[in-house]
Amino acid sequence: MAWVFLTAGIAVGSGWAYYELGWGGWWFWDPVENASFMPWLLGTALIHSLAVTEKRGAFRSWTVLLAIGAFSLSLLGTFLVRSGVITSVHAFATDPKRGLYILALLVIVIGCSLFLYAMRAPRLAGGGSFGLVSRETGLLGNNGLLTVGSASGLLGTLY
């Protein structure tokens, strides 16, 4: 459900920028636009990974890491928009104190999530096996491409 609303928000925002604001394009690779796009990419990979996890029992660790990554990128987007760290037409505040609180929350949530994952990862191991040419292999490749796309967006946004 969250992915549907994020998709709708990105689509409506792009349409609004194109038709109402007359910016002449749907997407400008603004850091705040990227902050919504990166969790969307990982969320898309997560949905595909969940399908395989539920059906075949595979990709369990991958699914957990995608969930942690998508939520972490959502928090990072909040930090980027509200802290004043980046310059953007979408940046809403330049209060460094607020940014520190959001950064602390970001570090705590990511740190605790990865710690819990590290503690329970051995229990997640296993799952089904599948051939080199199979639906699961295709979905794994798809997840890899979406993750690389999200990482590229993150690098471009922060660089």
What name fits each language-model region?
Residues M1-S14:
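A conserved hydrophobic secondary-structure block that centers on an alpha-helix together
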Residues M1-W3, V52-I68, P96-L100, S129-G141:
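Membrane-interfacial loop-to-helix junctions in multi-pass inner-membrane proteins
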Residues A11-A35, R56, L80-I102, G127-V133, ...:
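Membrane-interface interhelical loops and short amphipathic "cap" helices
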Residues G9-I10, G69-T78:
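Aromatic-anchored segments of alpha-helical transmembrane domains
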Residues A35-L50, Y101-A121, L146-A151:
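Hydrophobic cores of alpha-helical transmembrane segments in multi-pass inner/ER membrane proteins
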Residues H48-W62, I86-S88, F115-M119, R123-G128:
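Acidic/polar loop patches that form or flank catalytic/metal-binding clefts of enzymes
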Residues G77-H90, V109-L124, L145-Y159:
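Specific lipid-exposed transmembrane alpha-helices and their immediate membrane-water interface residues
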